[in-house]
Amino acid sequence: MGDPKRPRKKYETPRHPWEAERLEYERKLMRKYGLRRKKELWRHQTQLKRWRERAKELMARTDPEAQREREALFRKLYDLGILDKKPEEATLDDILRLTVEDVLERRLQTIVYRKGLAKTPLQARQLVVHRHIAIGDRIVTVPSYLVSREEEEEVDYSPYSPLKDEDHPIRCEARGESPEETAAEE
């Protein structure tokens, strides 16, 4: 089995630390997706880079094993919701066209915000970390969790969360009502 080595770093830092255009782009993405640290963004960029490198390797190969690996890569990215085309219709060029925003859209934090369970991406992050969000019966506390197509419909408030109650003040605000209006209706 061998000796365990240091775990591989999951992200690569930019080659140059002070490129104004890149810094502005990163700031825009961090604000849009509610990221706390650039390391989170770099982790997703590195993952995307690895998928693209894999696609380039598979483009050059023509053996039957490469075809099986292509299908597995297409299936994986389709199941994660990153590729829009079905695995049978997808091409390696589709993988090469992916952007980091395609990956960021699949984060649990982003999906909670897009489904209207939170008013802002940062509130979505807080709800995830504070155990208010569940996927099916399973509470997930990792905002960067990549939600698959299957799981996307199951994202909701945790059954153990006080937010599950329709009359909770945060849910009333998300609907555009004040908690007082809801109480007055009853």
UniProtKB/Swiss-Prot annotation:
Residues 163-178 have a biased composition (Basic and acidic residues). GO terms for molecular function: rRNA binding; structural constituent of ribosome. GO terms for cellular component: small ribosomal subunit. It holds the Pfam family S4. Keywords: Ribonucleoprotein, Ribosomal protein, RNA-binding, rRNA-binding. The keyword Transmembrane does not apply. Residues 106-170 form the S4 RNA-binding domain. One of its GO terms (biological process) is translation. One of the primary rRNA binding proteins, it binds directly to 16S rRNA where it nucleates assembly of the body of the 30S subunit. With S5 and S12 plays an important role in translational accuracy. Part of the 30S ribosomal subunit. Contacts protein S5. The interaction surface between S4 and S5 is involved in control of translational fidelity. Residues 151-186 are annotated as: Disordered. Belongs to the universal ribosomal protein uS4 family. InterPro entries: Ribosomal_uS4, Ribosomal_uS4_arc, Ribosomal_uS4_CS, Ribosomal_uS4_euk/arc, Ribosomal_uS4_N, S4_RNA-bd, S4_RNA-bd_sf. It comes from the Archaea. This is Small ribosomal subunit protein uS4. The gene is rps4. SUPFAM superfamilies: Alpha-L RNA-binding motif.
